Amino acid sequence: MTIVSPSILSADFTKLGADCRMVLDAGAQMLHYDVMDGHFVPNISFGVPVLKSLHKGMPAAFYDVHLMISHPLAYAEPFAKAGATLQNFHLECEDDIQQTIDAIKAQGCKVGLTIKPGTAPEALAPYLDQLDLVLVMSVEPGFGGQKFMPSSLEKLRWLREERARRSAHFLLEVDGGVDDATAPLCVEAGADILVAGSAVFGAADPAAAVRRLAAL
């Protein structure tokens, strides 16, 4: 079974809570919560208040918080207090990586690092033993509905091999253009977690879409 983390950026915001409950009831083990600052990426999404509201309504859910922001260090505590289970930030951010990892862990959250399509996975090497998750972006971050980049598969394979070599325990997540066609390729390459937005919330039957992905 594959872990499915539906990207709620693609949900219907007029019924966000109901959409989240629907995918959780269908078997999604996480909710992928994209935070964008309009600086690190050109788009702006949601922040601490929306997460706090979701957590209030669904306190048992796993909130996979993806910080597509230039300065994640300043938000380690606010997002932890709002209900983040895991805070996942970009290797390409402007803050000190080690300091940010330490700050997130100090708040009691799991920690992940993300790499954009132009970043080699080897750049993560100094931090892999400290991580709970590594996210490989298979599109340029910032907007949903982009086409999957096949080069991400080789990154997943390298990270899977490096994890085995180190006997590390981080999970491998892939995000961007994940659908019924690309998801099996990602799982074969080593992905433990599939982030899917349009493929879930844009499907005629989102619950069935979650179940299909989870069955891979």
Show where each model-derived region lies.
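Conserved N-terminal beta1-alpha1 strand-loop-helix module at the mouth
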Residues: 1-88, 94-96, 103-106, 110-111, ...
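Conserved beta-strand segments that form the floor/walls of ligand-binding pockets within enzyme
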Residues: 3, 114, 135-138, 173, ...
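Short secondary-structure boundary segments
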Residues: 35, 91, 115-117, 138-139, ...
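Active-site/ligand-binding-proximal alpha/beta "capping" segment
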Residues: 140, 147-193
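Acidic, Mg2+-coordinating phosphoryl-transfer loop and its flanking beta/alpha structural elements
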Residues: 191-196, 201-202
